Amino acid sequence: MCLILAIDKPDDVFPAQLLTTSLAVRYDIMTKKRIFLFLCAGLIQSVSAQTISIPTDAQQAAKRVRPEAIEAHMRYLSDDKLQGRKPGTPGFELAAQYVEKQFTELGFKPAGQKGGFRQAVPLRKAQVRDEGSTMALIQDGSTRQLTYGKNFFLSPNYNAAISEVSAPVVFVGFGVSAPELGYDDYAGVDVRGKIVACFNGAPSTFPSNQRAYSNSAKQEVAATRGAIGIITFSLPTDVSARIESNAPRNRQATYRWTDANGQAQRTYSQLKVIASMGDETARSLFAKADKTFEEARLTANKNQPQSFPLNISAQARTQTEITDGLIGENIIGLLPGTDPKLKDEYVVYVSHLDHLGITRPIKGDSINNGAHDNASGVSINLEAARLFSTLPKKPRRSILFVALTGEEMGLLGSDYFASNPTVPKDKIVANLCLDMPFFFHPLLDIVPYGSEHSSMKGAVEAAAKFVGVQIAQDPIPEQSVFMRSDHFSFVRQGIPAIYVKSGSTTGDDRNGTKLNLDWRATIYHTPQDDMNQPFDWTAAARHVQLQFLIGYLTAQANDRPVWNAGDFFGTKFGSKASVK
């Protein structure tokens, strides 16, 4: 909460939006004057942002942006001959060669492995074999065999072709442990050696990002608490999470990257079964528990922690087809810094180069060109790199540009690089990500995801002011956009990150957020995401200027960015940034 002591000053001294969202307490002062004394961290950051100036050289470089260059990059990267840029295909290789050529022409140095631009990302493909995968419920000596695809689905085990388990089942509410938010379903329950069962989702009282993170961390939390399996199922109101809705996706192969020891990452080998269960089957788990399914649902709807034994056991066998040998590649270019002390620190730009490749035809087309997703982000970052190359004096800190692989497989290229960077991890000070920035209308306002979490907000505000765009609030907080692209891989490593998206203002009667949501509903991840779309190249150029200036100001600052005091993600991950 912000405390404002209200005392007379001109209205334009402080941002109006802060005045409308802060708690004001008026004090009559003996002089009968009123001065505003703002006692909150958010305002301190805003005021400090006003002191950030953009040097003339950087201003001039920003004005040299070329919209036609962005378009040319996009046209090549989304051409049919690249066949959708799926990792491991000739099309992705053509895209990688193109990015390497651009880095070379701009004077960027190779920053990959073995003196080249590339970093190999070893990938493992895993897919559950239906015919060899089973699940049964055991209660009072009676066994009920379940039907795969009707009653349940299993997730692949990335580290074992056959995984078997039989254990009692304990219900743990949402399966969330967040004591920092005053909530812990695991408090007072011992789940060691047991299978936990829980609802999908997280308490609705959590802020949107914390809620999304808590939902995504269920497996990790269960494994940390000693569980040997996890079963999830949806609340009756959560149609999107039901296994019937996700049946096609549940049958697809999935991927993880592997470490030097051949272990798949972001997996938890102690979890011998990871299952999702249909509504009717989930209800049957509570048949002889102390609470019914309906009582547990009501408790969850009240956002109250809960846990209790279900007095039932589950037996499961997961058969997984595991395929190794696929190598993705990140493409990494370096612009060395110029400050003797700061040149060994790095500001990292990322955008994913990969897309979906060739899939089933839609409207007679089977090539997923990925013009907006994400030839647009790569092209904007390439033009931002060109602006850096035109500076008469390069930034104090070094700049890395990374064209990533494996985003469409689950942020794999960024997670691999952030976990295994080609520069010292503790020297990476900030990340800027661009993924589908959405320039189908004039760019009049932006949503800079991540700026609310760290001191990078100052650089964002200064850049936005120069470019002439307003900073808007997140119009779709329920979508948890902050966790849904490659920048979050850096957040997981404790590195502050910014992810800029276009806002809702279009300058006419259209609403940018509605345009975006409609696009996602009709064009996203289809072959129709090609160059036959109404791109606004002036808006794209403004995205370039923003990317360039935010990174430039971060690279020039005396101090590296820091997480805001008490920030959820800074508290959870910030300590990792100091690990080499």
Locations of regions flagged by a protein language model:
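Noncatalytic luminal/extracellular "stalk/propeptide" segments of secretory-pathway proteins
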Residues: 80-196, 200-203, 328, 455
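Metal-dependent peptidase/peptidase-like ectodomains
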Residues: 146, 260-293, 404-509, 513-515, ...
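Soluble metallo-hydrolase cores and metallopeptidase-like ectodomains found primarily
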Residues: 53-58, 140, 151-183, 266-370, ...
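N-terminal hydrophobic or amphipathic helices/low-complexity stretches enriched
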Residues: 49-112, 344, 579-580
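Second-shell loop/turn segments in exported
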Residues: 56-64, 80-90, 156-160, 181-184, ...
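His/Asp/Glu-rich mid-to-C-terminal helical/loop segments that flank catalytic regions of hydrolases
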Residues: 386, 390, 504-573
